[in-house]
């Protein structure tokens, strides 16, 4: 199955924060309409809506990358983005896990916030090295146990073909859904996860649809900046060689 998923999972056992408060905190404007949905709609949410529900003692926001693009892709540190700060004000003593993945480019990213402090952030996509800040979580430690390093990159052996190595970006489902399991209690891509996909959600359609951005836009920008620097250095070296020799 292909995945294009973006979720914010917030510990919310008391369940005393309304959807209206959440939408306001996220800067979502006037709502044009809403419709009943289910958690199953969290995959491929790309219609300009945002969905909210409650699952296993957690508030779950399906955001179509509206928040996670800012909280996972753009940061270059463990600082909170504006939307994360707003959510932390509503849930000051809660744990918050954000996860996102996109099968087409082997992209996955996730972060962990506790008591208003971001403790972990990692993103990776096809052809890119992992960008990460903070200490690994216990979920990550379990996955990395079976890994090895080759040419400064992390790999795993393919269970079906021991001669093949699996790159870190190809471990998308393991990292994404193990981190989500930290809050939900089950893996969404497993048999147990099927049981919670019928949990009721409400999809909200703002008058001004939320702006969706391709998750690989920032890595591409970063790559072009890197290439530009390399080209500039090569040109400078050529100039210096002519001057010196």
Task: Cite the ranges covered by each PLM segment.
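Juxtamembrane boundary at the C-terminal end of a transmembrane helix
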Residues: 237-245
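Juxtamembrane cytosolic/matrix-side boundary and N-terminal portion
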Residues: 216-233
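A contiguous, surface-oriented mixed alpha/beta subdomain in the mid-to-C-terminal portion of proteins
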Residues: 94-95, 105, 124, 220-221, ...
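Short, extreme N-terminal segment that most often corresponds to the first beta-strand
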Residues: 1-30
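Short loop/turn segments at secondary-structure transitions that flank enzyme active sites
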Residues: 14, 67, 127
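Long, compositionally biased intrinsically disordered terminal regions
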Residues: 120-218
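Short, intrinsically disordered low-complexity segments
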Residues: 27-119
């Amino acid at each position: 199955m292909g995945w294009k998923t973006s979720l914010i999972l917030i510990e919310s056992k008391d369940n005393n924060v309304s959807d209206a408060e959440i939408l306001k905190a996220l800067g979502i404007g006037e709502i044009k309409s809403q419709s009943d949905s289910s958690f199953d709609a969290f995959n491929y949410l790309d219609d300009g809506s945002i969905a909210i529900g409650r699952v296993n003692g957690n508030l779950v926001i399906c955001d179509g990358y509206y928040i996670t693009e800012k909280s996972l892709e753009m940061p270059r540190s463990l600082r909170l983005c504006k939307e994360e700060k707003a959510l932390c004000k509503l849930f000051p003593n809660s744990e918050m896990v954000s996860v996102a993945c996109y099968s087409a480019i082997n992209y996955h990213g996730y972060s962990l916030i506790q008591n208003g402090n971001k403790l972990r952030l990692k993103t990776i996509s096809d052809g890119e090295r992992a960008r990460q800040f903070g200490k690994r979580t216990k979920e990550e430690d379990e996955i990395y146990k079976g890994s090895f390093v080759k040419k400064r990159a992390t790999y795993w052996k393919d269970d079906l073909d021991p001669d093949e190595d699996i790159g870190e970006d190809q471990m998308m489902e393991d990292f994404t859904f193990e981190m989500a399991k930290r809050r939900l209690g089950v893996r969404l891509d497993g048999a147990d996860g099927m049981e919670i996909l019928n949990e009721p959600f409400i999809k909200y359609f703002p008058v001004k649809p939320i702006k969706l951005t391709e998750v690989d836009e920032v890595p591409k920008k970063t790559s072009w900046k890197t290439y530009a620097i390399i080209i500039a250095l090569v040109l400078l070296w050529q100039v210096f060689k002519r001057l010196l020799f």
